[in-house]
Amino acid sequence: MKKGLFVFFVAVLLVSFSQTFAQKSGTGNWFAYFGNQAINKKWNWWNEVQYRNYNFIGDRQQLLLRTGIGYNLTENNNNLSLGYAFINSQNYLPGTEDKIGFDEHRIYQQFLTRQNFGRVFLQHRYRIEERFLPDDFKMRFRYFLSLNVPINNKTLSANTIYASIYNEIFLNS
């Protein structure tokens, strides 16, 4: 088991290392805060702030503010949510130093479900977004999958160090 885990981590490291050299953009960063506050056993309040920069710091690319209310269908496993997001984007025009800014408003609905198989914890998120852009309206469907494996514990409890792999698929209409 330990040999298999070691091989897995080495493979992830090698794939990540090769992908690092494939990037063509400069240094940037992405600060994020995620909060989930229980209102009672059935209801929760979700909030999120993401601040993204070009050129390491001070050159804003995007500010995302998202909040929502969730209802637990089952304890710690299945949650339905409804929410709103405000996004301010500052994108560079291709081949120039000029930026164009715009605001986007999103209403979203999502279903979150969690599963565990021994020490492997999976999370699936299905989200539908109604996107209100300047002079346009679009729909987007998203599927997010994360896999977490605790390293120093058998469960994902407080102060647990864990490995995480995740990805998300976006389908724009």
Each language-model region and where it sits:
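Residues that define the transmembrane beta-barrel architecture of outer-membrane proteins
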Residues: 27-29, 61-63, 103-107, 137-143
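Transmembrane beta-strands of outer-membrane beta-barrel pores
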Residues: 49-55, 84-90, 115-117, 128-132, ...
